[in-house]
């Protein structure tokens, strides 16, 4: 966020990369996309140098992080094809929060038997976990106010990531849109229904939904079908990747109210599905190739 550093990266990427030693971590690198071609040159030269000296391959020279996957994925894959590994980072899983070993969620009988030995939580304890969410800062800082955190998160998300993609006058509509999606988490996607009361077209809603999916806010779970054409025609189900954020946007501020609400089934389903999705991602697997819903 240092504007002088960002200016150097944008205006003179070659000097920027010479200024800092490797391994180098570059945060929010999508703001300086010109860096990618110079990083490619450095990586290729380093590989050639190692090859001549009979050294092992060089990995981990640069760590690029970005919150705007819709930009970073395209630029990175085009500029650094064959030279990168892309990792999606989501909120904490329940196993991570409980300091348990990361484990892929699969319907295996032996795994299910082991789960019998785990602690059985009360319903209210489960909804307290759900409404708190999975963002690391909420667990790192025990004194942080959950509602204040989500308010700041949404404001920062819109001001930093979204403002570049939508008209400034549409920000209030976008907030209403994301709240409408939150209310419908766990349901089949109905664009027209989401648009109700906002005053946006279906085309705008589809664009904004694409932004939410590409920034990791929501996930579209496709229906299962052995017919690819039928799968395309059927509607996906939309899930928030952080159930706590969905609760905040839907207006639920405490676990007791959430537990007694008509929203409890959909948000519980959202919590479980997001845990399953994250278990695949954390094991280096593309969830879209393995997970579907069946009706």
Q: Over which residues does each language-model region extend?
A:
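Hydrophobic "anchor" residues on beta-strands that sit immediately upstream
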Residues: 23-24, 63, 292
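Short mixed-charge
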Residues: 48-57, 110-115, 290
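Interdomain motor-coupling "hinge/lid" segment immediately C-terminal to the ATP-binding subdomain
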Residues: 59, 69, 73-183, 187-188
């Amino acid at each position: 966020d240092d504007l002088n550093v960002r200016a150097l990266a944008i205006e003179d990427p070659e000097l920027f990369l010479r200024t800092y030693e490797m391994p180098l971590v570059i945060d929010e690198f999508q703001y300086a996309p010109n860096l990618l071609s110079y990083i490619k040159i450095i990586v290729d030269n380093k590989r050639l140098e190692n090859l001549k000296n009979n050294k092992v391959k060089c990995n981990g020279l640069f760590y690029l992080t970005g919150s705007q996957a819709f930009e970073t994925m395209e630029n990175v894959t085009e500029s650094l094809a064959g030279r990168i590994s892309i990792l999606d980072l989501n909120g904490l899983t329940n196993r991570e929060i409980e300091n348990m070993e990361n484990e892929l969620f699969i319907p295996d009988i032996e795994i299910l038997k082991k789960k019998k030995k785990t602690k059985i939580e009360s319903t209210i304890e489960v909804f307290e976990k759900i409404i708190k969410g999975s963002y690391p800062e909420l667990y790192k800082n025990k004194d942080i106010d959950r509602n204040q955190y989500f308010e700041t998160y949404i404001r920062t998300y819109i001001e930093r990531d979204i403002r570049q993609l939508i008209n400034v006058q549409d920000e209030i509509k976008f907030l209403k849109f994301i709240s409408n999606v939150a209310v419908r988490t766990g349901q089949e996607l109905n664009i027209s229904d989401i648009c109700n009361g906002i005053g946006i077209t279906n085309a705008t809603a589809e664009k904004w939904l694409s932004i939410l999916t590409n920034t990791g806010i929501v996930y579209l779970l496709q229906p299962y079908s052995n017919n690819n054409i039928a799968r395309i025609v059927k509607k996906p189900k939309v899930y928030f990747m952080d159930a706590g954020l969905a609760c905040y946007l839907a207006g639920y501020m405490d676990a007791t109210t959430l537990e007694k609400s008509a929203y409890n089934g959909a948000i519980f389903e959202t919590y479980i599905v997001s845990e399953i999705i994250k278990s695949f991602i954390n094991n280096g697997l593309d969830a879209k190739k393995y997970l579907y819903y069946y009706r």
